[in-house]
Amino acid sequence: GVCAVLGNLAIGHKLHCIFIDTGLLRKNESEQVMAYYHDNLGLNLRRIDAREEFLTALAGVSDPAEKERIVTERLMSILSREAAAIDDIRLVIQGTNVTDTLYRPHTGSTIDGLPIIEPVRELFKDEIRQVGQELGMPAVLVNRQPFPGSGLASRIMADVTAERLDILREADDIFRHDV
């Protein structure tokens, strides 16, 4: 989110944001992303509905590391495909932070030859939150709990199914808001 706002400040209407809805997000998170970044900020944001694609790719997989690998691979593939469809694209801005560099495999410095710019790569999450606050982003977005790339899939200790995701999404929502 902070990188989208920074990118918008830097290049304005030339920024094309791609939001990949994996179906592995918390309850209402997809709608919140679209409402804030597209509707409120007016960013050129396109939502890619890849929920079925991710469910299919994760079918029968229970190992957390394998889930993370599959999700990362699918995200990069979809991003590559969607970026190729944008005229005159010159670079990709990605929200990699220090924790990502320590715990996730490096995905490379280019996507299909396009350089990847990582403006918050050397910052920890609390520092990124400070940047978001300085940019005037709402607390509900800036203070969100960090969430792994594999999303809810990493919290399911079995293979990922739509039913398990729905149950976990509801349980997570109750825990975050009512407990």
Indicate residue ranges for each PLM-predicted region:
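Cofactor-binding loop segments of dinucleotide-utilizing enzymes, especially the Rossmann-like FAD-
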Residues: I20-T22, A50
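Active-site adenylate/phosphate-handling loop in enzymes that bind or generate adenylated species
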Residues: V5-L15, F19, N40-L41, L55-L135, ...
